[in-house]
Amino acid sequence: MRTKFIGSVLVCVLMLNSCTRDISAPEYPDVPLTANFAKGADVSWMTEMEASGLKFYNNSGTAQDLLQILKDKGINSIRLRTWVNPVSGWSNTEDMVKKAVRAKTMGFRIMLDIHYSDVWADPAVQTKPAAWAAQPFVTLKTTVFNYTVSVMNALKDKGITPEWVQVGNETNDGMLWPDGKASVNMKNYAELVQSGYTAVKSVSTTSKVIVHLSNGYDNTLFRWMFDGLKANGANWDVIGMSLYPVAATWQSLDKQCLSNMNDMVARYDKEVMLCEVGMPAAEPEASRAFLTDIIMKTNSVSKGLGVFYWEPEAYNDWQGYKLGAFDVTGKPTVAMDAFLVK
């Protein structure tokens, strides 16, 4: 995710210079979403933002619990990241569990996003937790298993069973570098995925394990990764994707993403999901058009499970992130209305 903080400024520049913006969503027939379609939001910044004094407001301007605002916008699922030992403490296991309890109490389904790092893990950076840095690979696999079990049990102790669990975040080139760098040693990465998969299932056989890559439009990347995992004996239940277009590109990227989703289902017989999406908060109408389209496209896939917006609550230039879906006053933009579809 860290790369998106830097990229969000560039995104806005590109959008301002685009002469081919399209903010109109295609018309869709009145077809309901499939049963249990996940309309989700990653709100991992929630507790940190609240602690900083920021408040969230509904469209009437009344201060409200963020989760209630999202629920009223049609969100039914919450995604939460967890880091191993972050310096700040935010997004550690304890903080994640607190948010999960709040979400579960309000009836949300839960996705757990395990980064296997003390900091952001994304396509550019997959740094081992400091405490794991010197471990030989055999020990590292055991540590991944034990840590995953501990996080799952922390939720289980609160009566929470996550419906989905990501084993790694945006692992385009594997995780826990250098040992698990897929372009160098796909077998090692597959074994790390398998350690996480086995750990999740040892605590909850019903939780679906996700392997998550960015650039959901890039079929070449996805075939390379999942062919490699399959050839090396790794198991997974769901293929997760990220998609962050701009106003000038969302229609073409949505089409490519749909093609990729259908190919993943046909090629691997696995479910697919958009685990992260976002567009600049400054372009709410374009964002609503994009979200409406990608929700309906995902719904059209035979094994399409849902769409999650990444940190929609980010506003007031929170940590420099500009791809949220709340305005400068802390209210949801019209982009979030896309999730009201039933």
Task: Specify the residue positions occupied by each region the protein language model found.
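Acidic (Asp/Glu)-rich catalytic clusters
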Residues: 32-35, 65-74, 98-109, 153-160, ...
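Bacterial N-terminal signal peptides
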Residues: 7-17
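Aromatic-rich peripheral "rim/lid" segments of glycoside hydrolase catalytic domains that contact
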Residues: 51-55, 263-269, 281-297, 301-342
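Bacterial Sec-dependent N-terminal signal peptides
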Residues: 2, 15-33
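Hydrophobic faces of well-ordered beta-strands that scaffold small-molecule active sites
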Residues: 38-43, 78-80, 110-114, 163-167, ...
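Active-site beta-loop-alpha junctions enriched in small/polar residues
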Residues: 43-46, 83-85, 115-119, 167-172, ...
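Active-site cleft segment of glycoside hydrolase catalytic domains centered on the general acid/base Glu
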Residues: 92-97, 101, 122-228, 232-236, ...
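N-terminal substrate-binding region of glycoside hydrolase catalytic domains
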Residues: 30-109, 115-144, 150, 166
